[in-house]
């Protein structure tokens, strides 16, 4: 406020306030945006849902609103997102047609089975069984590291084992078993949630001579 600036949440809140209190403007925008499609609907919060209702119109029969999302991927609760808006959408638009897509074109069945074992523990699980035609014999390993640096060293160790070592020290110290392993560095990807989590990995890769 001191800088006379608005962030994203402010823009949504201002838009909601304006549309809720200016009927002629609301009517013009509803006429302009006759079809509304929302992706990643599981990330919607109260202000965003209110904005959708104002734009689409609260006449359920006249609204042309399509929402796409997965309630089992709702991870933004810390900023107000609520998977409960799937239920509210059904209540506010009872004539809406629900289409459930259960086939995954991204992941193998091994990955999907592991994910569903975790998600199924939630009392809010949607009970949608995802399946894939991608077969895989590779198992999912779970490693709980005591610190972020220990985690980075574990990642380095796994890569070294699968490429056959990155130095003579790797061989002499017994960190690798087979120096003739067929993997290359280009076969690996390390995924992390936040950019801040990359620093221990960068340092561990640099120490071990792993290009990235």
Residue ranges with predicted function:
Residues 94-97, 102-211:
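Helicase P-loop NTPase motor core
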Residues 55-59, 93, 205:
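Active-site catalytic pocket residues across diverse enzymes, especially alpha/beta-hydrolases
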Residues 1-88, 100-107:
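Conserved helicase NTPase motor core
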């Amino acid at each position: 406020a001191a800088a006379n600036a608005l962030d994203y949440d402010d823009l949504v809140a201002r838009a909601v306030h304006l549309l809720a209190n200016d009927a002629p403007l609301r009517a013009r925008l509803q006429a302009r945006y006759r079809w509304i499609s929302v992706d990643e609907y599981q990330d919607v919060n109260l202000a965003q849902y209110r904005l959708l209702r104002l734009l689409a119109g609260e006449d359920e029969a006249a609204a042309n609103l399509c929402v796409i999302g997965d309630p089992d991927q709702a991870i933004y609760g810390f900023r107000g997102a609520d998977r409960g808006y799937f239920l509210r959408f059904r209540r506010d638009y009872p004539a809406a047609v629900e289409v459930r897509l259960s086939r995954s074109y991204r992941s193998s069945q091994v990955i999907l089975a592991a994910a569903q074992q975790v998600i199924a523990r939630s009392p809010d699980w949607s009970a949608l069984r995802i399946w894939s035609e991608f077969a895989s014999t590779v198992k999912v390993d779970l490693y709980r590291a005591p610190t972020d640096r220990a985690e980075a060293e574990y990642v380095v160790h796994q890569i070294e084992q699968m490429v056959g070592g990155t130095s003579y020290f790797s061989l002499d110290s017994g960190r690798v078993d087979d120096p003739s392993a067929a993997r290359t560095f280009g076969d690996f990807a390390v995924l992390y949630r936040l950019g801040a989590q990359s620093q221990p990995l960068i340092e561990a890769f640099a120490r071990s001579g792993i290009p990235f």
